[in-house]
């Protein structure tokens, strides 16, 4: 192969040709490498030689280049650190910093010296005042002042004793006792009406039947005679304006859109919207039948025929504090006699059947109510039994049923259930007492496990 290169004058294998003593004259770049022109040592025949390197660096050459670059970087970093140290040294030795340190030390020493002087002056002043008071107490004027102070103290003590005795005498008088009782009654009413709204749920001390009274509060309530004249003003169907009003509500686009927005607002679960409903409920009451069906007006009118003092807010408060606790506690504890008194026959049979089966197996009810809230009036409806008001509310319960051995057979004592109830309460028109007139006509419930 070297002989062929010598004959042609060009070569692509420089190592072998160099071993033969051939010298290079020139080189040319070709697509697959480099070609070198060569001649013999005597110089009479030019030769060419090609070397294909592929323009690639070897592993060692690349490693050496990387080492050189790292050394250059380290050198630059060392120079930067050296410059930084030189600048820090110059700043440390600058006149401005030295002057600032001297001023700081001067201020600190002056502060310590001033504190010591003030402490000494205060001690001297205290000693002078003590000596002056001692000298004044020895003089006639000081003795008179001391005696006057002691006399004033005795007089004040005697006055306090007199006021205390007078207060005891006043407290024993009939007028003061009557005033105190009045104040306590007002305080109790305020606590019941205001604080009772936000307080935690408390189980009734005794579950009462519908026909019983829980205390003097119910006995003192005035029972009205039936009033045959309707006190509520309702637009009658025979009125010439009724058909126009009906057409307006059914065909007006703006009114229907507004009514749809009102329904979405009432059904929203947003916390902010739920908190603002207290104000809008008042507005709805003022607007009357604009957002309520005619059937609700008929139901309220029928109730007012028997109970002219009926009020929606007071009715909801009665449900929250009296009706719901008694009925719901009887349901979860298996008090069948209480349920039978509060419920209609069909509702009682529906609720009593599982309770009777559990008692037949010897099971015991250990459920409890944690809270009752969000009591609201959903709608009204006229039924054969009488006017019906449908209420909704939420309750937090812990449902537990145990066998005679104490083992839990149903429920979980560590799990809180949030129940959504829908109750239909019917007004017994034959019962004049409002606290014994409402009976449970129907019930519906759904439950979800409360995580927090």
From Swiss-Prot:
One Gene Ontology biological process: intracellular protein transport
Primary residence: mitochondrion
Residue positions binding ATP: 166-173
GO cellular component: fibrillar center; mitochondrial inner membrane; mitochondrial matrix; mitochondrion; TIM23 mitochondrial import inner membrane translocase complex
Entry-linked Gene3D superfamilies: 3.10.450.240
Matching InterPro entries: NTF2-like_dom_sf, Tim44, Tim44-like, Tim44-like_dom
Keyword annotations from UniProtKB, A to Z: ATP-binding, Membrane, Mitochondrion, Mitochondrion inner membrane, Nucleotide-binding, Phosphoprotein, Protein transport, Transit peptide, Translocation, Transport
The UniProt record lists the keyword DNA-binding: no
Record localization: Mitochondrion inner membrane; Mitochondrion matrix
Membrane topology according to the record: Peripheral membrane protein
Keyword tRNA processing assigned: no
GO MF annotation terms: ATP binding; protein-folding chaperone binding
Residues with PTM Phosphoserine: 180
Residue ranges that the Swiss-Prot or TrEMBL entry lists as coiled coil: none
Family: Belongs to the Tim44 family.
Entry-linked PANTHER family: MITOCHONDRIAL IMPORT INNER MEMBRANE TRANSLOCASE SUBUNIT TIM44 (PTHR10721:SF1)
Purpose: Essential component of the PAM complex, a complex required for the translocation of transit peptide-containing proteins from the inner membrane into the mitochondrial matrix in an ATP-dependent manner. Recruits mitochondrial HSP70 to drive protein translocation into the matrix using ATP as an energy source.
Protein name (record): Mitochondrial import inner membrane translocase subunit TIM44
Organism, scientific name: Homo sapiens
Gene: TIMM44
